[in-house]
Design a protein with these regions (language model features):
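Glycine-rich beta-to-alpha transition loops that act as phosphate-gripper elements at the mouths
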Residues: 18-19, 80-84, 102-104
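A glycine-centered beta-loop-beta connector
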Residues: 29-32, 37-52, 91, 99-119
Length: 139
């Protein structure tokens, strides 16, 4: 049975602003268990900071750098009804590890979900998609 983006996507995408420090972005990624953070400006999504971008910046005064200094300006997006196999091809062709799913209503510039290589591997293994866990309640 063919799977679609909506079947394997992880709902929720961490975001930051252009001036967010790389140290703060690293904290967001760690807290959200995310491979990337979408950079937002006043119109919508304008870039992506990936784990690779952070690691590449680590030796070069990363504590002085912000999202705009290291982000990839291209945010690849797909619709929820795209075939998972087509998305896998796109990711390989574009040399990216994730693509983002935009809100289904027109004019929304903020991604609502993400498809990662990990999600595709989980699908290949016959595992359920990763879903965000509710926060633990402290007693």
């Amino acid at each position: 049975m063919s799977k679609f983006v909506r079947d394997i996507m992880k709902i929720g995408v961490p975001t930051c602003e252009m001036e967010t420090s790389l140290a703060e972005i690293a904290k967001i990624m760690a807290r959200e268990n995310a491979d990337a953070v979408v950079v937002m400006d006043e119109v919508g999504s304008c870039g992506v900071v990936s784990q690779s971008d952070l690691v590449r910046a680590y030796p070069r005064n990363y504590d002085l750098l912000t999202a705009k200094d290291v982000m990839t300006a291209k945010v690849l997006t797909v619709p929820p009804d795209a075939a998972a196999t087509a998305v896998a091809h796109m990711m390989m062709d574009e040399h990216v590890h994730q693509v983002f799913v935009l809100h289904e209503h027109p004019g929304a510039g903020k991604p609502s979900a993400v498809v990662t290589m990990r999600a595709i591997v989980r699908e290949m293994a016959g595992l359920e998609p990763e879903r965000p866990q509710p926060p633990l309640k402290r007693k």
